[in-house]
Amino acid sequence: VRRMIANKLGDESPFQAPLALNVVPWAGSVKDDGWSSEELKVRNESRKILGIPDLKVSATCVRVPVVTTHSLAVHAVFERDIDVDAARQALIEAPSVVVIDEPGEGEFPTPVDVVGSDPTFVGRIRQALDFPNTLELFVCGDNLRKGAALNTAQIAELVAAEVSGGSSDS
């Protein structure tokens, strides 16, 4: 522990920087133009799962000192203005999604809360201040049970279906 806190990595570490008491803005291997393999994976898997080959996705993967779970800060841009209440309701009604969204009461999903759980947890649901067509939300899920890209895609699909007035089969 002292070695970790002193920011010394042993020769056996697979990480580029110490993880203990740290946040590292890198996950995966180096790819073109400064992207990591994990960031490209989020983009490619989201496109594949949604069946939208030209879906615009940009992700920055960050390693944080948690045992398990993936968390995402999602910035979803839509063609039309978003109704936050309708988006929240769509998420509440979605199978395998649990909404915990009372930040004023200290209620929002965290990795500690979701370990060992099957559902995807969503909170901090809000409209971007300067962009009425943009929804901001925080997503957590146990990645040993369900992958991050699938979670992101399913949530985006549900919100998109609600915004367009359609329904989702997910």
Regions found by a protein language model. Name each.
Residues 55-170:
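C-terminal active-site/capping subdomain that shapes the small-molecule cofactor and substrate pocket
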Residues 1-90:
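Active-site-lining helix/loop region of Rossmann-like oxidoreductase modules
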